[in-house]
Curated annotation (Swiss-Prot):
Belongs to the WD repeat POC1 family. Residues 380-412 form a coiled coil. PANTHER family: POC1 CENTRIOLAR PROTEIN HOMOLOG A, WD REPEAT-CONTAINING PROTEIN 55. This is POC1 centriolar protein homolog A. It comes from Danio rerio. It holds the Pfam family WD40. It comes from the Eukaryota. WD repeats lie at residues 16-55, 58-97, 100-139, 142-181, 184-223, 226-265, 268-307. The keyword Nucleotidyltransferase does not apply. Disulfide bonds: none annotated. GO terms for cellular component: centriole; ciliary basal body. Keywords: Cilium biogenesis/degradation, Coiled coil, Repeat, WD repeat. Residues 311-340 are annotated as: Disordered.
Length: 416
């Protein structure tokens, strides 16, 4: 019987950096991968065979983060030299310089519409920028230590930040007001990202753990202790059902969020694994670290289970910034500690705020508030249907495996 889960496979690797790689990002089309390095350079790797890579130099110190804009017309990079650069990802490598902070800039993140840029810095601040005007919109100063990472939610309504002050802060992107502060019980988080549904966040921590938080109820949903050293980065699969992590223990881990278990451990890097990223389609992912090479993997394990569900989500939702997959050895729960709550409702859409204080009506005379509510209910029903479909697939797979085991047992007894 063929399994619905196939192991991830290493497709290719790229070498060209002269020091540890700190950050990765796929272009929206999946045709390019950008990487930043301690060697102060940004490189853009073309996935087409025999295509040359672009090397961009301009930063005066280590590059800490890179990200493509949603249109792929720009590539942002941050650096320890306290600046941010916006590059045109072509052979010329032209860039615009932002003198952003008074300390090292740790991360950059484009908003879903590509109009804004979010930066986090060792100067303990988060800054929101207008990409077009190249001006600061506002500065947020609620952290009291280095801010390691700040991200926009896929739906554009929220922002999240993590700091060495051992807090995770959730912000309203429109009002720029602090909504909630999560306190980390162990070490500090060096990386944070939103679930594709914008309902949860995951943090990568210095205490070797990964935590998944529900931002609606402000509760800890899942807690994974699967690494033996600090977790440096993570990336959600676009389906929202798997989470990829990179650690200083040199391994990559793939977590099944629906079942709350470790699915694969990937070995390949020599030394610390510092960054991971799924492609927007989810069929590939990339990893990199102190061994100065970018590894590109074919996801495989997710293609049978969730490709149809992912397509359904695209048909019903506005596409959001997403990522790709991994490879390795199947893992069971034994020997690994996890604290898990079900994520079956994790894809539920966030409720939409009413746009104006006045009742609005559409062309058919139906109140806008009622239309919005009905659309939200329909969205919730779609998510429920997709979740049930996934559970049915898993149940069928389990039944098939059980049947095969019973047949093998019966055959063994017959032979003896």
């Amino acid at each position: 019987m063929s399994s619905a889960l196939d192991d991830p496979t290493l497709e290719r690797n790229f070498k060209g950096h002269r020091d540890a790689i700190t950050s990765l990002d796929f272009s929206p089309s999946g045709k390019q991968i950008a990487s930043g390095s301690v060697d102060a350079s940004v490189m853009v790797w073309n996935m087409k065979p025999q295509s040359r890579a672009y090397r961009f130099t301009g930063h005066k110190d280590a590059v800490t983060c890179v990200q493509f804009s949603p249109s792929a017309h720009l590539l942002a990079s941050s650096s320890r030299d306290k600046t941010v650069r916006l590059w045109v990802p072509s052979v010329k490598g032209e860039s615009v310089l932002f003198r952003a902070h008074t300390g090292s800039v740790r991360s950059v993140c484009f908003s879903a519409d590509g109009q804004s840029l979010l930066t986090a810095s060792d100067d303990q601040s988060i800054k929101l920028w207008s990409v077009h005007r190249q001006k600061i919109i506002c500065t947020l100063r609620e952290h009291n230590n280095w801010v390691r990472c700040a991200r926009f939610s896929p739906d554009g309504q929220l922002m999240v930040s993590v700091s060495d002050d051992r807090t995770v802060k959730l912000w309203d992107a429109s009002s720029r007001q602090l909504i909630h502060t999560f306190c980390e019980p162990g070490g500090y988080s060096s990386y944070v990202d939103f679930h594709p549904s914008s309902t949860c966040i995951a943090t990568a921590s210095s205490d070797n753990t990964v935590r998944v938080w529900d931002i609606r109820t402000h509760t800890l949903l899942q807690h994974y202790q699967v690494h033996s050293a600090a977790v440096n980065a993570l990336s959600f699969h676009p389906s929202g059902n798997h989470l990829l992590t990179a650690s200083s223990d040199s391994t990559l881990k793939i977590l099944d969020l629906l079942e709350g278990r470790l699915l694969y451990t990937l070995h390949g890097h020599q030394g610390s694994a510092s960054c991971v990223s799924f492609s927007r389609s989810g069929d590939q992912f990339a990893s990199a670290g102190s061994d100065q090479q970018v590894m590109v993997w074919r996801t495989n394990f997710d293609s049978v289970d969730y490709s149809r569900v992912l397509q359904q989500k695209r048909d019903h939702r506005t596409p959001s910034a997403q990522a790709s997959g991994a490879a390795g050895d199947p893992e069971s729960r034994s020997g690994q500690k996890t604290e898990v709550s079900p994520l079956l409702g994790v894809s539920a859409e966030r409720s939409v705020r009413e746009p104006t204080p006045q009742q609005q009506t559409d062309a058919d005379g139906v109140p806008a508030a009622l239309t919005s509510t009905l659309q939200h209910i329909i969205g919730q029903l779609d998510v429920l249907t997709q979740t049930v479909a996934i559970l049915e697939q898993r149940l069928t797979l389990t039944e098939d495996k059980l049947k095969e085991c019973l047949e093998q047992q019966h055959q063994a007894l017959t032979e003896h």
